[in-house]
Design a protein with these regions (language model features):
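Active-site nucleophilic cysteine motif
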Residues: 131-164
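Non-catalytic ligand/cofactor/substrate-binding and regulatory segments of enzyme domains
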Residues: 4-137, 148-149, 169, 174-184
Length: 184
């Protein structure tokens, strides 16, 4: 309920006035030599935020001095901009007034290998120039694609990640949701 109230409060504010700075959840690369992979979700802007989140992935290889943030953004796609955006914002920035929830936080040995697989999944995303709020493809379709392509992430997107099942074949699962086939 608190998230819903915060979303409604943000709904009446001009989007350019909303907080978009760092949330302090990503370790400082200047003092963190180890590799890092993080996945975030934040409520969307306006009334849609009652029902939906925007997700993204941030990676920092060993000894890197900065993060790389991967996400899908719809703004401008209809005018020829790519849907997949790189480094549009910091790794853990607020999403138009909403503090993101960290869904994945991997660090240390073996994470550089995972980062290489994440980058390969980003490059092979099947909808790099497409965006549609519902049913997808959207930011959650992208993040789900990477998660399915890199099972070591152990990514579990929330129910509010609308679009995560955009391409899936319908079928029952033990949890009663949609069948989510692994990436090939």
């Amino acid at each position: 309920m608190v998230a819903g109230c915060a979303t409604l409060r943000r709904a009446g504010t001009n989007f350019w006035e909303l907080e978009r700075g760092p949330s302090g959840q990503a370790p400082d690369p200047a003092t963190t030599p180890e590799p890092v992979v993080q996945v975030y979700a934040a409520r969307t802007v306006g009334l849609r935020g009652l029902f939906a989140v925007h997700t993204w992935i941030a990676v920092k290889p060993r000894d890197a001095i900065s993060y790389t943030r991967y996400e899908v953004i719809g703004w401008g796609v209809d005018r020829g901009a790519p849907a997949v955006r790189v480094n549009r914002a910091g790794p853990d920035n607020y999403w138009f007034g909403d503090r993101p929830e960290r869904l994945v936080d991997l660090r240390g040995d073996g994470v550089d290998t995972i980062i290489a697989r994440v980058e390969s999944a980003v490059a092979s995303y099947p909808y790099p120039s497409a965006y549609r709020i519902w049913p997808g493809p959207n930011s959650n379709t992208f993040t789900a694609w990477v998660g399915r392509s890199v099972p070591e992430l152990k990514l579990k997107l929330p129910l509010t990640a609308i679009g995560k099942d955009y391409w899936c074949r319908r079928g029952a699962t033990a949890a009663g949701g949609l069948y989510q086939p692994p990436a090939e």
